[in-house]
């Protein structure tokens, strides 16, 4: 489904128009970073991309972050199909992951079932409904409710959360 159609159905025609006109908050933030969103991209299943990120996590947070950056740029800016094995495996190779191992991981029904379970848990326990999603807590106060929010946020949001946690 085209992203504009998806946005109109989920958030209403104003969200779709904002995405088309590139005047929305997210587009403005992205433009400051030299990123232009492809408003012709297609919405599709993200389970395999989540499985690939899961695979990358076994090589450490830095490798995982490198991969996520490649995936985000490919999908949001270049309009690559996030459910395409071709795109996902190119991204894996780009960050130095083994293509055959990555393919085996993303095509594994057991891995997909586990990752779907983790996604469902994130939705039910933390209200995760999109990316990016942030959960910030003070580990020295484990009984205190963590802060959880989705979407692009200005630096002031993070500063405010960190100040409240200290």
What are these regions (language model features)?
Residues 54-166:
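C-terminal cap of thioredoxin/glutaredoxin-like
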